[in-house]
């Protein structure tokens, strides 16, 4: 009887820690940005002055100098040539913002698109990737394409020279670590 009691006590002692588990560290859910422009302004604000280059934001009809800007969707058809949004995908965009290198768009171009209801980031991102990869480039050749999404709400597309893309990607990751990558690859 004593042997059984001792065996039972040893088993209870051995298994006492089985129910415990180390606390799991979770990354808090990131708050959804209020607008496409907020995403670009947040990233641009992370740049040191020494990293910044001359940019223009928005579109030609309503541009902002040296800052990201909202893209006036009254002129949405222009997104096909300056942000490479396929013509059949313009209706997928509910809101847009951009920042483009002032001297040469192929050096750096970025658009953030808030998607219309029912549009998936995966489908829109794939269409953007095809458009960039199949574009006929003039006045320089961008080196890298980056496409990220924030759920099915926002898709960010950026392309440019690595000297511009590397700090942009770094600051984007700092500002929005929860964004998922759809594409990050060399432009062939």
Sequence positions of predicted segments:
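C-terminal motif of bacterial Sec signal peptides marking the signal peptidase cleavage site
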Residues: 13-17
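A short, solvent-exposed beta-edge/loop patch
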Residues: 102-103, 114, 139-184
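Bacterial N-terminal signal peptides that target proteins for export
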Residues: 1-5
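Surface-exposed, polar/charged faces of alpha-helical domains
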Residues: 90-91, 116-123, 130-134, 141, ...
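Surface-exposed, low-hydrophobicity interaction/linker segments
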Residues: 44, 48-102, 120-136
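A short acidic-to-branched-hydrophobic micro-motif
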Residues: 107-117
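Bacterial signal peptide processing site
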Residues: 19-21
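Post-signal peptide N-terminal segment of mature Sec-exported envelope proteins
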Residues: 25-45
């Amino acid at each position: 009887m004593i042997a059984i009691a001792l065996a039972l006590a040893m088993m209870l002692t051995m298994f006492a820690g089985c129910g415990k588990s180390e606390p799991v560290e979770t990354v808090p859910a990131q708050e959804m940005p209020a607008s496409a422009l907020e995403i670009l302004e947040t990233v641009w604000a992370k740049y040191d002055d020494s990293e910044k280059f001359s940019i223009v934001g928005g579109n030609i009809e309503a541009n902002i100098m040296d800052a990201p800007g909202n893209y006036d969707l009254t002129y949405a058809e222009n997104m096909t040539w300056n942000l490479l949004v396929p013509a059949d995908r313009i209706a997928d965009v509910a809101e847009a913002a951009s920042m483009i290198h002032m001297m040469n768009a192929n050096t750096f171009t970025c658009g953030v698109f808030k998607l219309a209801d029912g549009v998936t980031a995966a489908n829109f991102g794939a269409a953007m990737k095809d458009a960039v990869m199949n574009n006929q480039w003039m006045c320089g050749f961008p080196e890298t394409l980056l496409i990220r999404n924030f759920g099915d709400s926002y898709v960010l597309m950026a392309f440019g020279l690595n000297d511009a893309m590397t700090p942009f990607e770094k600051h984007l990751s700092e500002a929005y670590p929860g964004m998922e990558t759809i594409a990050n690859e060399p432009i062939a």
